[in-house]
Amino acid sequence: MAHLYSTLKENKPDNLEVYADLEGAFIGSSTVPVEIMLTNSRPDITLIDRRHEPASVTLVELTIPFTSGINAAADRKRARYEFLSNDIKDAGFQCQTIPIEVCSRGHINSRNRSSLASIFHTCQVKKYQQTIKSLSKLSLLGSYTVYNSRNSDSWNIVSLLKP
């Protein structure tokens, strides 16, 4: 998630806000600013596009499932934020929830590539293919790290994976 957040943050236009459930990247106790909705929910990434009236809010949820669980993961994430999305719409904003699944072996299917393309377009990310490859590689490396640590009694703080 850190790589996706930093890519979006580095490329975004000035009137687009990007928040993430990462240290130093959220507001208060949420990734949704209070002027949008008072909530303790923390979508992985929240995009607020103020180029339009009303502002457009995009809630992004990133999941790393097994390939066989990709559709179930998307359904779970959509359902998890359905009430928040509806509350934001009721408050007068446009809102959509976009679940993104990068399979634990690094595969990104066409639906997720399309969703990422939409997010990248909004944030004006130019290096689409490079970012997709990096997300895929990070998923695979992260899964491999978890696998190698499966018999460990404790987790040590490990430096962030670099694509």
Report the location of each language-model feature:
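Active-site metal-binding core of divalent-cation-utilizing nuclease and nuclease-like domains
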Residues: 1-59
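Amphipathic alpha-helical protein-protein interaction segments
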Residues: 35-38, 53, 67-74, 121, ...
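Short beta-strand-loop-alpha-helix junction that forms the active-site gateway
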Residues: 42-45, 56, 61-76, 102-104
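Residues that form ligand- and interface-recognition hot spots within folded domains
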Residues: 49-51, 62-66, 85, 101-106, ...
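Short helix-terminating capping/connector loops at secondary-structure junctions
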Residues: 53-55, 90-96
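Aromatic/acidic cage segments in peptide-binding pockets
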Residues: 74-82, 116-122
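Metal-dependent nuclease catalytic cores in nucleic-acid-processing enzymes
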Residues: 78-92
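Domain-level recognition of nuclease-like catalytic cores that cleave nucleotide substrates
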Residues: 95-163
